[in-house]
Amino acid sequence: MSKQLNREEAWALLTEYNQDPFHLHHARTVEGVMRYFAQELGYGDEVDFWGIVGLLHDLDFERYPDQHCIQSQEIMRERDLDERLIHATASHGYGITVDIQPEHEMEKVLFATDELTGLIGAAALMRPSKLSLIHI
C-alpha cells in the first residue's frame, strides 16, 4: 500500500535532497500557489495534497538537474509513495525530460505554476527591494 505524506514529512524529504535557499523558496512558493488553486477550483478536500505536489515538484532538481523528473520518480517509489504524487510531480517535466503528460487539472496547474512563479520571482529580483517584501 502506498504512503501518503503529511506536510512535515514532505518538507523533510525535500530538504534531504535540497539545501539551496533559492530552491527551497521556490518549492514553498509553488506549494502556496497550488494550495490556493486547489481551493479556488473546488478541490478543497485535496488542498494539502495539491500543496505537497507543489512542494515536492522539484525534489530531484538540485542533485540531478540532468535527470529532473526522472530521479524523483525513483526516489518516491523507493519510499513507496502514492503513484498520484509521483505522476503529478513528474508531469511538470513533460516535453523536457519525461513523456508523462499533465492530465488532471492539478497537473496542468502545476505545469503552469512552476514556470509562472519562476518568472514572477525573477521579475521581483529586478526590483530594488528584491524579495524582501514577499512573505510566504
Feature roles, as predicted:
Residues I134-I136:
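Conserved small/polar residues in nucleotide/adenosyl-binding loops
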Residues L5, E9, H25-T29, Q67, ...:
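Conserved active-site and cofactor/substrate-binding residues in soluble primary-metabolism enzymes
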Residues Q101-L131:
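A contiguous pocket-lining binding segment that forms or flanks enzyme active sites
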Residues V33, D58, G95-T97, P128-S129:
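A short structural micro-motif
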Residues D45-M76, L85-I96:
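His-Asp-centered metal-binding catalytic motifs of divalent-metal-dependent phosphohydrolases/nucleases
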Residues V33-F37, S72, M76, L119-L125:
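Buried hydrophobic packing segments
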Residues S2-E8, L81-P102:
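Acidic-glycine-rich active-site phosphate/pyrophosphate-binding loop
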Residues M1-Y64:
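Acidic/His-rich, divalent-metal-binding segments that scaffold phosphate/diphosphate chemistry
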